[in-house]
Amino acid sequence: PYANVLNEAYESSLYPKNFICSLPESNEYFGAKVIFGSKDDAKHTGLNIVREIPEAELKTLKLLHDGGAFTLPDEFKKSICWFLCAAAILRSREHKKPISMLIHTTALQSGHFEEYDVLKNWLIREANTGSILQLCRDVYESEKDEFTLKDLSEAYPDYGRLSQVNSEFPVFDKIETEIRILLSNIQNIMMGEDKSPVYREDGIHLCVDNCKANRLA
């Protein structure tokens, strides 16, 4: 059966329905109903964490997948910066586990490789000039008050870890150093002498899901 990623527990949405069963949802689970809301459940109104992409940028993204564009759309850049800010906050709070961002903008593997090249070049170039830091600052200042603990408690009052959420956003200057560290090493995942992956804490690992070869590239 296909993966029921961000799927709902309705019989009609499960395939094959006579082969698998849906487990009860945990009160710590963020599924599509919580994120996007449900027209059938007034208790779930959705979370203000989804940003729409302008039609013009969708066209640029399509060109990028086809190898016809050499820059990232603005909203794409903003999403990368917001991830860097979020990762920097966690790192500043002594978070030790890996932090990842899944970028999935096309079903075509070739498009992901085109996107990878443009993204890597953009990160390296902007890190060298320092201009990405200003974009991170701008995105941080515009987004940090768009979704608050109050918003979360109203949209998902049954969330099991609501009392553990740290609602304080540090000033950008407090996380800038962590962002600089992340941008200081942009590379693939290297392999050690024993052929096992070697991960670094002071940088960003970029990889493409090379499912045809059953490996990461």
Protein language model annotation of sequence segments:
Residues 1-90, 134-146:
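Conserved P-loop NTPase catalytic core
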Residues 89, 93-216:
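Conserved C-terminal RecA-like helicase domain
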